[in-house]
Amino acid sequence: MELESLFQDIMDGFAVYNNKVAVAVSGGIDSIVLLHLITSWAEKRQCPPPIALAVNHGLRPESQEEVEFVVSYAKELGVKKSFILNWKRQNIKGNVQSQARKARYELLTEWCKNNDVKHLFIAHHKDDQAETFLLRLERGSGLDGLSSMDYKSSLNGVCMLRPLLSFSRSRIKKYADFYRLKWVEDRSNQSLKYKRTLYRNLLKASGNQEILTERICLTTLHIKRATKALMHYTRLAFNDCVNVHDLGYIEIKLSEFYKLPEEIALRLLLYSIMVISSKHYKPRYNSLIAIFNKVLQKDNDVHCTLSGCKIRKYGESILIIRESSKIQEISVSLPLNAPIEWDNRFSCTILGNQECSVTIAPLKKTQKIPKFLKDYDCCPEVFYSLPVVLKDGKVLAYLHLNHDRKNINGDEVQCIINSTIKQNLVILAGI
């Protein structure tokens, strides 16, 4: 079939040969077709077969039966390994679909990271792209949102691949019928209480669904080109305007910031907040633009919080500082064999031979700033978001920056920190 031939070319372009890959499989027609196509491609290219991952949200009575179908049918299709990931939901309020979607991707990417799988395949297709565009247009999304989904993106450190984006729902159905594939029908896909169903029906009712879908997808490509150009200039602006400090915060030089076009300046502020907060999702636009407008009013004092960050005007700069109360403490047993990630801003190496359980917490918990930190010429609020090693609630070790490390004897404990913010910026925005 033509679809199969085109799919093989797309897969070859992804260059995932001999790497372990996983496929998110709901049991619906799209993901079953994707699994069949990838299994066939892997066999022809003599690559390892894909791993099938099925998420059980437990929201419908038939959920368990559907994920069990995925496991059994994947085996029929030649898949050697399949896993069911269960969502342990608690106190669901508000938009259930949105929370289920977020949980699904967290479960999938977490499994991939824990099992050294770097590529996760998703069965989004051309009709999904058009529906997503209309949904985001209604919500008032900016250019990034309207550019919709890409063939390749990154989430939680996992590469997400969408090889079906070029194919319509009708072509996928023809493929499934040709190979007599089995799938389950999710009745909630027909429910009019969901906006996506309304837009799906709107496209059908247009009388020229295929042409309209094609035009919408073409529009998303135009927007994507524009956003890539904006990101190019945002990266250049980071080089001129931003200092990423070893103490885990970002400084934006206002003299350079004020010279930027507003869209570039807004993006620079946005990505600075996202990388310090360690959140993959953008803050609400209304909250972000309110802070941005305050920053643009040159005589204004800026003293705001957003997404677990403090945004402060300090001298001739804007500082993006982690909010200490939002930092999660972690408990570890000493001695450690390897560095440990803390708050997604620091890699902490704890040296010493003591055998004990300790907590790595924000310095704010001690209510005390050690004298050596006061030698740093920066806003004192920065110090409270730094790590400190506690044993039984008492300070066992303060931090040392990697370039300040010193030799210690076996009885001492030392916490050496390296900022990971620059690496995270590269992952987040290619900066």
UniProtKB/Swiss-Prot annotation:
UniProt-listed GO biological process terms: tRNA modification
Record-annotated membrane-spanning stretches: none
Known role: Ligates lysine onto the cytidine present at position 34 of the AUA codon-specific tRNA(Ile) that contains the anticodon CAU, in an ATP-dependent manner. Cytidine is converted to lysidine, thus changing the amino acid specificity of the tRNA from methionine to isoleucine.
Domain notes: The N-terminal region contains the highly conserved SGGXDS motif, predicted to be a P-loop motif involved in ATP binding.
Key word Cytoplasm present: yes
EC number: 6.3.4.19
A Pfam family the protein falls into: ATP_bind_3
Coiled coil ranges: none
UniProt keyword list: ATP-binding, Cytoplasm, Ligase, Nucleotide-binding, tRNA processing
Record field: catalytic activity: cytidine(34) in tRNA(Ile2) + L-lysine + ATP = lysidine(34) in tRNA(Ile2) + AMP + diphosphate + H(+)
Gene Ontology MF terms: ATP binding; tRNA(Ile)-lysidine synthase activity
Localization per Swiss-Prot or TrEMBL: Cytoplasm
A GO cellular component annotation in the UniProt record: cytoplasm
Source organism, top-level taxon: Bacteria
Family to which the UniProt record says this protein belongs: Belongs to the tRNA(Ile)-lysidine synthase family.
InterPro entries (alphabetical): Rossmann-like_a/b/a_fold, TilS/TtcA_N, tRNA_Ile_lys_synt, tRNA_Ile_lys_synt_N
Protein name: tRNA(Ile)-lysidine synthase
Binding site for ATP: S26, G27, G28, I29, D30, S31
Nucleotide-binding among keywords: yes
